[in-house]
Amino acid sequence: MNLASQSGEAGAGQLLFANFNQDNTSLAVGSKSGYKFFSLSSVDKLEQIYECTDTEDVCIVERLFSSSLVAIVSLKAPRKLKVCHFKKGTEICNYSYSNTILAVKLNRQRLIVCLEESLYIHNIRDMKVLHTIRETPPNPAGLCALSINNDNCYLAYPGSASIGEVQVFDTINLRAANMIPAHDSPLAALAFDASGTKLATASEKGTVIRVFSIPEGQKLFEFRRGVKRCVSICSLAFSMDGMFLSASSNTETVHIFKLEAVREKPPEEPTTWTGYFGKVLMASTSYLPSQVTEMFNQGRAFATVRLPFCGHKNICSLTTIQKIPRLLVGASDGYLYMYNLDPQEGGECALMRQHRLDGSMETTSEIVDSASHDCPLATQTYGTAAAKGAYVPSSPTRLGKGQDANLEAYTDDLGAVGGACLEDEASALRLDEDSEHPPMILRTD
């Protein structure tokens, strides 16, 4: 979640970025002063597990599961991606691109770099560029989603700037898998489930959430977030078991939907006048316009969360902490909110804790009463905020780091420049160990 405003200013607490890792076990936060990682193993305490202040103005920071591999982009060099081993404090490699980096996605097979009109697919084991998807429709928000499943390793991105088409790309076989006509309006949010077999979508209108099978593109579920007003969807997130889907927006309500097939009950003859009227009403839907009929068949929220603010950009996560299902919301006001979810009854979720993203903690009573952190929403994306630097020529570059400045990098034919690794670090990094997954081949040519 990018938090920079149009002028490049950070959100509350100098925040520029916040995101959960792939299995929702940690939270990454980028700020004017660097970046931090927090463990999400406890509700009572937000444990800071790492802090880096060597790189300023971190606008993108993505961690690979619970490994030491991290991808970083800074506002000071918005076209440059650095891949680092954060526990050792070493840089593995770097790449420069022809335009501003808007998003980076990781799984154990691939690293995706999203520019406004192109997508770069890297092999995460050696960081080579495997494929480039060029001339994509303008995507200034950097909207894309990457499945975390090794077998169903799909990438989803907008196929149109005017309607809600989703392009699904197979990043293993490097070929297009499907095009899904998901919405009439342009896309606003995308999310895969953990198995990579379901894709949730929302449009800029924000009233309907749809779930499709992947790669077939068959519509499995359709949920109505609301009718009264159009909203800006900030985030979609599946639970790890794929049973629940959360949708957050710029309103004070987060909706949680339950993905279960509706069991058809055998028809019963009505015994009252109201029962008879209801039967006639349902029968009459076959004569109504298709848009109205769809509203009768759309699912409603299984559970809801009432946030103590309205208008903040945010990102949500459905996870299990201390054996209890939780909804986590990281917001541009500089706070992480933790709610309990009742998986049987649903209803309104209880707010358990609120933590400042600088590591301090506030109790629930302080949350409700305090309004000092209720700052305006950072509505503009990082892509519109970052200043465009000079064009990076397609020629070999050198790493400008002291004694290593003589080490030549390489240029990929597909347009990304860089990728050189430091020879001294190649022997020090033991990324073939299980604790340092994935194994990477560090090239020193």
Swiss-Prot record:
| Entry-annotated residues carrying Phosphoserine | 395
Q: Write down a Pfam family by its short name.
A: PROPPIN
Against InterPro entries, the record matches this protein to:
PROPPIN, WD40/YVTN_repeat-like_dom_sf, WD40_repeat_dom_sf, WD40_rpt
Q: Which Gene3D superfamilies match?
A: YVTN repeat-like/Quinoprotein amine dehydrogenase
- Protein's GO biological process: autophagosome assembly; cellular response to starvation; protein localization to phagophore assembly site; xenophagy
UniProt topology in membrane = Peripheral membrane protein
Keyword match Phosphoprotein: yes
Q: State any GO CC term.
A: phagophore assembly site
User: Does the keyword Phosphoprotein belong to this entry?
Assistant: yes
Per the annotation, the residue ranges of the short sequence motif L/FRRG motif are 223-226
Compartment(s) of residence: Preautophagosomal structure membrane
**What keywords are annotated for this sequence in UniProt?**
Autophagy, Lipid-binding, Membrane, Phosphoprotein, Repeat, WD repeat
Mostly located where? membrane
Q: What Gene Ontology terms describe what this protein does at the molecular function level?
A: phosphatidylinositol-3,5-bisphosphate binding; phosphatidylinositol-3-phosphate binding
WD repeats mapped onto the chain: 182-222, 228-267, 311-349
Cite the record's note on assembly: Interacts with TECPR1. Interacts with ATG16L1. Interacts with ATG5. Interacts with WIPI1. Interacts with WDR45. May interact with NUDC. Interacts with ULK1 and RB1CC1.
UniProt record similarity statement: Belongs to the WD repeat PROPPIN family.
Q: What is known of its domains?
A: The L/FRRG motif is required for recruitment to PtdIns3P.
Job description of the protein: Component of the autophagy machinery that controls the major intracellular degradation process by which cytoplasmic materials are packaged into autophagosomes and delivered to lysosomes for degradation. Involved in an early step of the formation of preautophagosomal structures. Binds and is activated by phosphatidylinositol 3-phosphate (PtdIns3P) forming on membranes of the endoplasmic reticulum upon activation of the upstream ULK1 and PI3 kinases. Mediates ER-isolation membranes contacts by interacting with the ULK1:RB1CC1 complex and PtdIns3P.
Query: What is the protein name given in its UniProt record?
Result: WD repeat domain phosphoinositide-interacting protein 2
